[in-house]
Amino acid sequence: KGLIARGMFPVFCVCGGKDMGVRRLMEFLGNVVPFVSEMPKVQNTEGKEVAPDTNGPESLYFFKTSVEPHIGEVSYFKVMSGKVHEGDDLLNADRGSKERIAQIYVVAGGNRVKVEELQAGDIGAAVKLKDVKTGNTLNGKDCDYKFNFIKYPNSKYTRAIKPVNEADVEKMMSILNRMREEDPTWVIEQSKELKQTLVHGQGEFCLLYTSPSPRDMR
């Protein structure tokens, strides 16, 4: 009940690299976390409640984008309603563009498993989409759902950043904007008063861990 009412937020300490705490987390997800059908219905931008109904209209919400070597952009989504299949032609409700879902995957760590179908409540990934950004909604025929962009907590930590070589400023900004697409909790600011580029994030570790390295600037 606490999880359903969003009054309880369990915290787990895990390390994927050393496989510490992962089993406990997975057991909790499998045994305790409510089914999607038990959760409150989600409201779209018009305030209409959308039930996670597998027989409903097809609608996907994209909540994360990452760029991976040799693959390119990987777009992560949740099936908000209906079912999605390989080869489905969908419409981007935010950008007005058409998109074909060539392949769909379920993801476990660094592993991607190709599947033919995902249903309402499932989380999956698609690769090499043409015009999909974090926060976009893709809909099937005769569906006009559009979901609000996820509201993230305000940034807690700020750090100034500059390239080793001044000639690399444009390249650095390009990398920062790409990282912003991958992690919307990043806020990039060009401070006129300080004449510095500032990055704001959720914590010091987050900024240190994800800041561009000299290798990225090549």
Report residues per predicted region.
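P-loop NTPase catalytic nucleotide-binding module
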Residues: K1-P69, G124
